[in-house]
Amino acid sequence: MTNTVTVLAESTGFSAVNTIWVLLGAALVFFMQAGFAMVETGFTRAKNAGNIIMKNLMDFCIGTPLFWLFGFGLMFGDGKFIGAYKGIADSTYASAAPDGVPFFAFLIFQTVFCATAATIVSGAMAERTKFISYCIYSAIISLLVYPIEAHWICGGGWLADLGFHDFAGSTCVHMAGGVAAFVGAAILGPRIGKYDKNGKAKAIPGHSLTLGALGCFILWFCWFGFNGASTTSMEGDAIPLAGKVFVTTNLAAAVATITTMIFTWIKYKKPDVSMTLNASLAGLVAITAPCDTVSPVSAAIIGIVAGILVVVGVEFIDQVLKIDDPVGACGVHMLNGMWGTIAVGLFSDGTCGEKGLFTGGGAHLLGIQLLGMVSVIAWVAITMTIVFQIIKHTIGLRASEQEEILGLDVTEHGLVSSYADFAPAMSQAMLSYTKDDAKSVVKVDKSTEPVVPVEKAIKVESYATDAPSADGTPKMTKVAIICKQQKLNDLITALEDIDVTGVTVTNVLGCGMQKGQPEYYRGAVVETNLLPKVKVEVVICKVPTRAVIDAAKAALYTGHIGDGKIFVYNIENVVKIRTNEEGYDALQDD
């Protein structure tokens, strides 16, 4: 079998080792999708985990046929600005493949690179983007935006003729994806609760740094294929070059990670885990363009700058520009893609082209790199602004207020939780949410007419008696209110208005199925559905029970089934442990 393959390779002019090298690289770059999915899922909230996984899956699945049908032709067709389209990707474009590599091996290699550029946007627009709108974006970037700018650099376009150098995609993949992410996040607006009324940024922590770290390690591992296999050969001079690429890639990432750890340790008094994970990716992005043409010392310097740039960039975008990027995609990919592009013009040792400014080559290469960087930024920014604005003003770009607060897993996909048998954690940002935090989203609760009266929407079940206590002291009553999570702030405000200040809030799951609105899992109807709710409990003595019930109804009522339930119970006694007071006295404020 081995001899047959060798003879066939020789007779067709293909190189078995080069083909294997390219296919191995394609497999590793494909697996980067899993890395991105884990990073984005871990850095965001659990209620959106399924939605993020779905978006990463669809990035690749939508992009693959579109790149095959149209994108590859635009990227590798003849022409300096736009490739001349000659039909779907087939042997017509065989001349685009590197020496010794079959066309279809080269096609899959380019396909996975296109998918990488598309998936970068997912993290920056996470937790508030309509799924259908994201799918449309994904199709357009794979069909048109990426192939055209990549043609300029990798497909024999005008930047390639000028000597622009982007070995594995700092510019055409990462910077382009980062710019698209920046534009999308800016047009989309911040998540509910991200900024207070004064515009100060508030942290919305991700639910699993463990998943984020797993994604980071997957991406680091796969980056050896992303950069290393971009040699497209393992023969002749490409053999030592591949080793050099592996070393510079690894070194830049490691140094960037150390730099950010030290920088955040000094800045925040403790080393920041999420920023340090971002730094590993920032170093990888920055070294992707110059990895073949810089020395290990230069790679370390590139890593140092990347480690500082990612922290400063993420903070600037988040706190100064007020653009909400949940995973730091803009700081990692856009800013460090720019830095990697510029680094070629500064540190190139001439291995694969001109020398850079700091290595005796003057400013010529740096000028070309800057021209290419600005050109790609302009192309992506303009086209993606048009795309996102059209989507925004037609089918809508952003999920509704109610959908965002409940989570896109349940509202977009009917998925109550991505973690079976685990109750979702209640976000601190959700607890402090106010209507003013979401001026750019649709107010769902106010947009529809009530369909049932308040008595049916909010049922009251009383287990309390009206008889006074045996010793004549004021009667104590517990009121338990089950309601939607997004109504919690309104309810607490209403209770405070009637001088009920002590409340206990518990995260619970409610079981129910609304008529005419079945949910499906793998095609089967889900007969019961556990939905996230909150239980608010108050024990009252001085405040009338009826006043609490009326206040709760006023705060929770929308006129739809599921507004909530109120339970009323007798309380035999209350003991305040600190003062040993009992009964009425134990319920009074100090």
Locate the predicted segments by residue.
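Positively charged, small/polar-rich N-terminal and surface patches that mediate targeting and assembly
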Residues: 411-415, 430-590
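Glycine- and aromatic-enriched membrane alpha-helices
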Residues: 3-463
